[in-house]
Amino acid sequence: MNQIVLSGKNISMKFGKRVVLDDINIDIRAGEVTALLGPNGAGKSTLLKLLCGEISSNHDIAYFGKQKHDWEPEKSAKHIAMLPQHSTLTFPFLAREVVELGAIPLSLSNKETTKLALHYMEQTDVMHLAESLYPSLSGGEKQRLHLARVMTQLHQSGEERILMLDEPTSALDLAHQHNTLKIAREAAKTQNAAVVVVLHDLNLASQYADRLVLLHNGKLVCDDTPWNALTPERIEHVYSYRSIVTKHPTLDFPQVHAAA
């Protein structure tokens, strides 16, 4: 079993009187893609923001066996990267310059920074936009650009890296949805990264994730493999939706279909 590199214990959160997360315990392992799933308002993005520190808290959260609050920001930035659901940037940077921002924690020359940024821009299919102004890009192009930025940020992390992605496919077309999740899976399998990704598409999650964590009304109701997690009974409980689960005709993962 792979090493636990990110853990959260007894995580609870309220917004006013509303319970958003209710006593969540979660372990994230190196070399695996873990997908956080659930309906709107289930607590997926809030949990991810707590795990990465975007929402400050005193919860028992540890990276590589060391409590989150004991990490120096300069050190954690080399090992832990977060791609938020929305990235607000209005200054007219070149697209390439936005990706180069990911290299700020690294000790690189300007030439090395540009070379690295272009490498990840090629992976995310935004190389042709390198000299374009960031505000002129579409939502999907910006999303792929920021994926290149966080991949750049983790370039020097060795095998101690945690990549967190909050709905990274929400603005993408079909081909780029798959390419984004292939990049995430490749990081897990070839670089031993621990990848945590918030998704809505159960079939994408089933195809690319090793583990599915299902949230419902702020509670963790399942943490298991796709085959064990995606049962019609559990899907109906979590999503109030009747479904049929079948095996993909050529690949070994379950697919979810409407029951009627």
Can you say where each PLM-predicted feature lies in the sequence?
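Conserved ABC ATPase signature
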Residues: L133-L137, E141
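Catalytic Walker B motif of ABC-type/P-loop ATPase nucleotide-binding domains
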Residues: E160-E167
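The feature captures the beta-strand-to-loop junction immediately N-terminal to the Walker
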Residues: L37-P39
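Conserved structural motif at the start of ABC-family nucleotide-binding domains
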Residues: L6-G8, V20-D23
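Conserved ABC transporter NBD signature motif
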Residues: H59-H69
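ABC ATPase nucleotide-binding domains
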Residues: T231-P232, E236-A260
